[in-house]
Swiss-Prot record:
The keyword Cytoplasm does not apply. It catalyses: 2 superoxide + 2 H(+) = H2O2 + O2. This is Superoxide dismutase [Fe]. GO terms for molecular function: metal ion binding; superoxide dismutase activity. The gene is sodB. Keywords: Iron, Metal-binding, Oxidoreductase. Its EC number is 1.15.1.1. Coiled coil: none annotated. It comes from Nostoc sp. (strain PCC 7120 / SAG 25.82 / UTEX 2576). SUPFAM superfamilies: Fe,Mn superoxide dismutase (SOD), C-terminal domain (SSF54719), Fe,Mn superoxide dismutase (SOD), N-terminal domain (SSF46609). Binds 1 Fe cation per subunit. Fe cation binds at residues 28, 80, 162, 166. The keyword Iron applies. Its cofactor is Fe cation. Homodimer.
Length: 200
């Protein structure tokens, strides 16, 4: 059973007016994400991992140093699909309802969450990801290097931001802080995060 690249939840140009060009998706989704899927299929073809779910492959390979290449590609396939869903046209704003109340409880305020998330994304050295997670019933912000993700650590991801340079270089060049601000102001999909929280 081959691993597949999930379709984008919007078209390539849907986020143009919100700070993310169609060209970004042509490269990021059309080339980078696709390459991870293709590499994962090559690395797992004919192995016992070929029939596992993507999540199972991530968890198995993370614990086995000999499967580092499989882990990196599997995690990046999962991370990118999760990232596309963490974005939406006319995103931003603020969460509502039970999820908003939980944010206030665990962070003190929504502004404090945004501050912690922005800091995590800005201070991740080199390539990686910033995450909002549910860690045993407590909401936390974390960051991971390269392909690593909360799933590998037994945590529930609610939302992510890709801070690899290829995620923002077409739109923001080397200005990662501007990319982070635009994500929180115009792109972040709090409905997706709330739905993940409800399932946690």
């Amino acid at each position: 059973m081959a691993f597949v690249q999930e379709p984008l939840p919007y078209d390539f140009n849907a986020l143009e007016q919100y700070g993310m060009k169609g060209e970004t998706f042509e490269y990021h989704y059309g080339k980078h994400h696709k390459a991870y899927v293709d590499n994962l299929n090559k690395l797992t073809d004919g192995t016992e991992l070929a029939d596992k779910s993507l999540e199972e492959v991530i968890q198995i390979a993370f614990k086995d140093a000999s499967k580092a290449g499989i882990f990196n590609n599997a995690a990046q396939v999962w991370n990118h699909t999760f990232f596309w869903n963490s974005l939406k046209p006319a995103g931003g704003g603020a969460p509502t309802g039970e999820f908003a109340a939980k944010i206030n409880q665990d962070f003190g305020s929504f502004d404090k969450l945004k501050e912690e998330f922005s800091n995590a994304a800005a201070t991740q050295f080199g390539s990686g990801w910033a995450w909002l997670i549910d860690d045993g019933g407590t909401l936390k912000v974390t960051k991971t290097p390269n392909a690593e993700n909360p799933l590998a650590h037994g945590q529930k991801a609610l939302l992510t931001l890709d801070v690899w340079e290829h995620a923002y270089y077409i739109d923001f060049r080397n200005a990662r802080p501007a990319f982070i601000k635009n994500y929180l102001d115009n792109l972040v999909n709090w409905d997706f995060a709330a739905a993940n929280y409800a399932k946690a």
